[in-house]
Amino acid sequence: YERELKYLIKKNEKYTSKQFLEFLYENGYKLVESFEKEKHETYYDDNDFSILKRGDVMRGSNMVTEQFKGFLYKTNKCNPQKPYVSKLELGTKLRGQYKDVNEFIKELNIDVKGQLNIKLFANMKREVSIVEKDGDRLYVSYDKVKYFEKDESNSVYEEMLEIEDWKNPNTTNVDYDYDRHLIKVNNLISNAQLPIELTKDSKYFRGYTVLNNR
């Protein structure tokens, strides 16, 4: 289970990971650690786009930095009253075991129409900072993403921020009621009028929509 705030850097605005961290420091956060990652993601769907329509995500990740490949299915659990995105991750225990996406989806018993095939690629460079304040931790990712359907030379580029509640890192144990921290952070950001805008779109939805509306 994953709960995170997502923001797009507004078009024609320059807003860096460093600037956002400065903003957090001014508001009492301390840096715990920071590192960089690179990953190439592939998004799959059937020809009816059933997964896209549900707001779910079926992705294959090639973690360049960690040299790891695997599939993951994310079910949309968003509450329209809340500013953050909630997703239930399926297949985490099977990651790395399957070479074929259709075998993976069959194992999870997900409702799709026929075979899945590739609908979108996203190559990203991610700057990660883990920050802390009053015992609450945030996993802040600043992503530079290129979306494309076949060839990277015909891609769309975007920058975005993801802020994940990191109270229990790398676990599926979530205190469902404890979302005060993320709500507080979102209020902080809204009041500061930073050049970023809240979004609930997955990267799959975002990339597919942006590429097809050019």
Describe the function of each predicted region.
Residues 1-214:
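Phosphate-end processing signature that detects enzymes handling 5′-triphosphorylated RNA
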